[in-house]
């Protein structure tokens, strides 16, 4: 036999849940969003509150192990992690640039969704832009390797992947080494493009790596 819930039963249950504090329809998470489709974003670190263990987006994160990346108490800043590029031999139409922190392409896909991502742009010294020209088909992997600056150091990075129309490419992002590292990935993908991105996080056990990602099609 099947039980049928009436509308008034559902409403009564919802009212009861509110009474006991199960949820509050007007409660927002630390990003200021009521739903995942309404996430607050900003490049300004001061627009975000410091995450707490009871915040919904952070309650499963051991904040003490983030070494201050979430609240600004991280160890002294150092230069961005060195980046090396491995592009298949004979490939044309693929460009890797080191750019200043104010390069618009680093922000083209949107703003960070949390305080750590915004801290990247507050502390960023330079970034990396990978551009794949229109109609370029890459045979093999484009690999970018980011190497930590060392134990008890902190660095920040930003990567923009700009894929033109009707491109085909596989991009591998590899992270290795020691240190605290926060970065932001901006993906701007053109019409008809097919781009696969694989992330290999092979940093040492004493390292901390946090990343924000935004995609624009």
Predicted regions and their residues:
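Glycine-rich and polybasic anion-binding loops at the starts of cofactor/ligand-binding domains
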Residues: 1-217
């Amino acid at each position: 036999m099947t039980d049928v819930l009436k509308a008034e039963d559902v409403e009564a249950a919802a009212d009861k849940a509110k009474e006991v504090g199960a949820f509050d329809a007007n409660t927002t998470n630390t990003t200021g969003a009521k739903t995942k489709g309404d996430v607050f974003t900003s490049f300004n670190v001061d627009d975000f509150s410091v995450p707490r263990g009871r915040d919904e987006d952070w309650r499963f994160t051991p904040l003490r192990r983030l070494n201050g990346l979430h609240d600004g108490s991280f160890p002294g800043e150092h230069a961005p992690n060195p980046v090396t590029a491995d592009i298949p031999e004979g490939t044309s139409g693929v460009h890797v640039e080191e750019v200043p922190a104010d390069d618009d392409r680093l922000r083209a896909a949107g703003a960070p969704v949390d305080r750590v991502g915004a801290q990247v742009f507050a502390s960023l010294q330079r970034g990396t832009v990978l551009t794949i020209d229109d109609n370029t088909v890459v045979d093999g992997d484009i690999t970018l390797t980011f190497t930590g600056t060392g134990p008890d150091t902190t660095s920040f990075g930003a990567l923009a992947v700009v894929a033109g129309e009707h491109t085909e490419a596989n991009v591998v992002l590899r992270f290795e080494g020691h240190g605290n590292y926060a970065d932001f990935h901006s993906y701007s993908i053109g019409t008809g493009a097919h781009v696969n991105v694989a992330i290999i996080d092979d940093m040492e056990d004493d390292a901390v790596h946090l990343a924000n990602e935004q995609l624009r099609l």
